[in-house]
From Swiss-Prot:
UniProt key word Glycosyltransferase: no
SUPFAM superfamilies per record: S-adenosyl-L-methionine-dependent methyltransferases (SSF53335)
EC number of the protein: 2.1.1.-
Family: Belongs to the methyltransferase superfamily.
Organism taxonomic ancestry: Bacteria, Bacillati, Cyanobacteriota, Cyanophyceae, Nostocales
PANTHER family: DNA METHYLASE (MODIFICATION METHYLASE) (METHYLTRANSFERASE)-RELATED, DNA METHYLTRANSFERASE YEEA-RELATED
Gene: nspVM
Protein name: Type II methyltransferase M.NspV
Keyword Hydrolase: no
BP GO annotations: DNA restriction-modification system; methylation
Function: A gamma subtype methylase that recognizes the double-stranded sequence 5'-TTCGAA-3', and methylates it on an unknown base to protect it against the NspV endonuclease.
UniProt cross-references to InterPro entries, sorted A to Z: N4_N6_ade-DNA_methylase, SAM-dependent_MTases_sf
Record-level Gene Ontology MF annotations: DNA binding; methyltransferase activity
Enzyme class of the recorded protein, top EC level: transferase
């Protein structure tokens, strides 16, 4: 059981900003010409940001600090700086209950919203039965499978930042927040998708190990707002001190990591690819569906010896194997119960009775899989399967690893190789075509192209949408 204090810190994504870092952030903002009349910190914690801001922004007439943790508020009120200065307005409040429009909307002067919002996702909240969440709604507007297979998991700070951006749309002001770098891009995506006002934005990488003792890719995210500008790009700085940067922005409504590099290679870009990268099989029950072969004996993830027909068993190459080039042999196998999504599975009972008995033995695990993709589907269904899964030749890459290395993979033991759902692949019937294609994909030109698109700090940096954006026909004409 998580101790109550620890649970509270986890629930609120509680990473208190050291005064040293708060001062550096404020100094940077001053260098950039930020000089607000009003300062707001929505989750002020121990008050380090509002303290640093009071020293740096001497013109500020009012500094608001809102905090849900009453223990922190008690400590703030003990600090001498906050005792006798009427410009400070420190309140107890829950971000998700505060009417930010009424607070910010009343202010007709230049505003700075500054701080450090919680670094926690809604799924992490669920794992500890946390309640520090906004009212549930699909604010990212994900559709279909994206909404039900986990893409709708989001950082709490993402929702909070969107709310603050909305409040600043009718103001001249700034937003300066510490957040995960991936969250800053999601906010830029939101602003772009909604065609909101944005005069300028930038991120400055921060040393989270030094300041927070965690290994998280995070940044100072700065946005400048006015009443007319719609500048949907973001300058990326390696740290707060440097003046060197590169610019991310949009091409064909897709966020691009390096606009300059893509401009040089834009003839290779397509949003109507003739080929389609697929992901491997998803089953959400590895302990039953994946087996290890040891001395001609199959063992499942529960440690059980499994005696079944090999009719529905196929060699499995996991994403880590693809990344490490362990592709010519495997001791892992996967039960593939369907050839296409939604195919009836009853025929397994007749074609492979021992396999059916095995599945029924573990029906409780299989029937209680949480994902909605299995609802109202045949028993023991899988996902991410089709005729492409059984092609003899495949070109594969793991979406989780931070390297662009494509592997050509053939059959193993006369059976087509199957991948897990961390792998993306192209399928081929013809070995020669597959061989030529993998050579194209591993060319320096292809790597330069993909490198201009991939954000390596993301959990799954390589995505099918990125892979599909390379026009292989054009690339072949350039190289061959």
């Amino acid at each position: 059981m998580i101790h109550n204090v620890e649970k509270t810190k986890l629930e609120y994504g509680d990473f208190q900003t050291p005064l040293e870092l708060a001062e550096k952030v404020c100094e940077k903002l001053v260098q950039l010409g930020v000089n607000p009349d009003i300062i707001v910190e929505p989750t002020c914690g121990l008050g380090n940001f509002i303290e640093a801001a009071s020293y740096s922004f001497t013109r500020a007439k009012k500094i608001f600090g809102i905090e849900i943790n009453s223990n922190y508020l008690d400590k703030i009120k003990e600090k001498q700086i906050f005792l006798n200065d009427e410009k400070f307005d420190i309140r107890c409040g829950d971000f998700f209950q505060v009417d930010w429009s009424s607070i910010i909307g009343q202010l007709n002067k230049e505003i700075l919203i500054i701080g450090n919002l919680p670094w926690v996702t809604n799924s992490q909240q669920g794992s500890i039965d946390g309640e520090n969440l906004p009212i549930k709604n699909n604010f990212q507007n994900y559709h279909g499978l994206d909404a039900i297979t986990g893409k709708s998991n989001f950082d709490i700070s993402e929702w909070m930042l969107i709310r603050l951006v909305q409040c600043l749309q009718k103001h001249n002001g700034y937003l300066a927040m510490l957040c995960k770098t991936s969250v800053s891009r999601k906010i830029l995506n939101y602003i772009h998708s909604q065609k909101l006002n944005l005069a300028y934005s930038a991120t400055y990488k921060i040393d989270t190990r030094k300041y927070f003792r965690v290994n998280v890719d995070a940044c100072l995210f700065l946005c400048k707002f006015d009443l007319i500008s719609k500048n949907y790009f973001c300058d990326i700085f390696d740290n707060i001190e440097t003046s060197k940067y590169y610019r991310i922005g949009y091409h064909n409504n897709v966020l691009i990591k390096d606009l300059v590099a893509l401009k040089r290679l834009k003839n290779l870009y397509t949003n109507k690819s003739n080929i389609k990268w697929r992901s491997g099989i998803k089953h959400d029950c590895a302990s039953v569906m994946e087996l290890q072969k040891i001395n001609d004996t199959f063992i499942n993830g529960l440690g059980e010896i499994v005696d079944i027909e090999e009719t529905y068993l196929f060699p499995l190459i996991k994403g880590s194997y693809v990344a490490q080039n362990k592709i010519n042999a495997t001791d892992r196998y996967i039960l593939v119960t369907q050839k296409i999504i939604g195919e009836p599975t009853d025929n397994i009972r007749d074609l492979a009775p021992k396999t059916w008995q095995y599945l029924e033995k573990h029906e409780k695990l299989l029937d209680t899989r949480k994902s909605k993709i299995y609802q109202n589907k045949p028993r023991f269904s899988i996902f991410g399967v089709g005729s492409y899964s059984f092609s003899p030749w495949k070109i594969a890459i793991c979406g989780l690893y931070k390297k662009l290395e494509f592997r050509l993979i053939g059959k193993i033991s006369e059976k087509p190789t199957i991948f897990d759902d961390t792998v993306y692949f192209l399928s081929f019937e013809d070995e020669e075509i597959a061989f030529k294609t993998v050579a194209l994909l591993n060319s320096s030109l292809a790597r330069d192209f993909y490198s201009s698109l991939v954000f390596w700090d993301e959990k799954r940096p390589i995505k099918s949408s990125i892979l599909n954006s390379l026009d292989l026909e054009v690339l072949a004409k350039v190289i061959l």
